[in-house]
Amino acid sequence: MKALYMVFVLWVLIGCFLRCKERMGSEEKQAQEDPGDQDL
């Protein structure tokens, strides 16, 4: 159970980190105004 709890906590932290990174990236893209820079 402890391992599952640690995996869950890591998953939440990674999710928040990726979300923050995505938000920062979208702000940078808006500042550059380059619509042809999205290949996700």
Swiss-Prot record:
GO terms (BP aspect): response to toxic substance
Signal sequence, start to end: 1-20
A Pfam family hit: PROL5-SMR
Cysteine pairings via disulfide bonds: none
Chief site of localization: secreted
UniProt keyword annotations, A-Z: Detoxification, Secreted, Signal
Protein task: May play a role in protection or detoxification.
Protein name in UniProt: Submaxillary gland androgen-regulated protein 2, isoform epsilon
